[in-house]
């Protein structure tokens, strides 16, 4: 029997992500390039949903299949995960999910595993929904590593942690920044200047540099910098360039990775950001001539716990980076003139990478909560913290500091 193009793509994504440590978005872009819009949307839902929910799916397969997932052949493991996701979380016809999972195993030339796959899919068809309903609220039911759930609970409390995990398992708003020209047809204004909600991103408008896909959390970080014409601005860790292109003044954008630096240059040219000079350098070891800046943006690498909804595999590979973040912040402080300001932003919800890094820097905090009260940090109002379950956008911590 045939296997739909969307399921073939989702199966490939599951195989590559969990067996070859590939990145879901990169595999998906390549695998889905020939799909039409409808197939692509279905393939993305299956791919990203199954990757996100894999902890819960594996529990269901272990429980109902009566054989540990880790001991299965990789193609069988991927096919069962795909089938289980459809049965547990979509309205796909059960026979289609089961039959095509079996066919994927057959096509992998694992005929000996076909009866087992068929039997497990039958058990999942009958039992996965009751099993999912019986799970207690928490990281197993919502499919997060325990350490992430514990981090959220420590920083936000039990109820908000649970609401946050649920929110990042569902699609968030799609927002674009209007770079030039009119907003897209049907776009809805938001509370940020130039930021509009859209049903879908107009790829032609992106290619022409008229709009840029960028969450409100990300745009807020760029706005808080507040740079003006005539000022010298340092932007560390700049790629892919969304926030960089928001900055006014004479901007020096630093990026370590040569490939990402090239991507940054291409994006800035597309967006018409002629005020930016790209420098390939380590943000913790800047060239000596980069001195005397009026402002800096340190949009530091982080665990990404605020963008787990947009990056489905990140929850399984996330790593906190407080030492690197502090090194970057201190590096920026050495290059900004006395009295100048630094905006520290990270797309994570983790006190160890957020306020603890700011405190360790020893820099003076300039309060932000009164300027942006709707985004004020719930415990520390001098900072901003966008939260997916509260604001409907990606999670960002933002602090403004004075040298």
Where would I find each of the regions flagged by the language model?
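S-adenosylmethionine
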Residues: 1-403
